[in-house]
Amino acid sequence: GNLPFKAIVTLVNQGEFDLASTQVEVGLSGFLAEDFGVTAADKGKLKNQPPDDNPIARKKDSEGNILEAIEVSVPFPSKADGDDFNYARPLPGNRPFLFRAEVCYRYGAQVVSEICVLKNMIDIIDDAPCDPSESKSVFSSASPLGITAFRQNVVGKDKIQFSFDIVHSGSGDVFAIDPNLDNARIHILNALIELNRATPDT
């Protein structure tokens, strides 16, 4: 053909955490690569390509203004390859071609809730400031995996138990970084608990 071109995939980090370009992989599929001048040896260059810059998350400045994330791009073929796509077959008229981008990336989620800790979790006084045996409200950041239905249960005079549901939203798939799932589970949850005692009796 006489119209060489590149396919540009643009990405915007809508999460709360910055990403390095090495933590994002983009692939291009949905079309017959040979028709666009891609040899069998070069097909691998259409997979697992990083963006040209780090996808930085949006920020909030000291005055509370939201600073939106800046788009980063992934060109196909990559800049290092030099060559462009070029449709090699006769094209009698306008014909649409579907290019599909597949993105795999790391992400994190922040979840905040309140728990109830009393001096005596079984013999609760009438004016106790909270109930140690009830479901708690959850405030979760947007991510493909979120925590819902956070629950607290009393299992002893000075013991409590937490349970929660991890829900997958969206149409993507979830992959563990570590192929050993049992070891990967150790890194799923990092909890920070802050205790504020209301009175000496609670």
Which residues does each PLM region occupy?
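Non-catalytic macromolecular-recognition regions in eukaryotic signaling proteins
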Residues: G1-T202
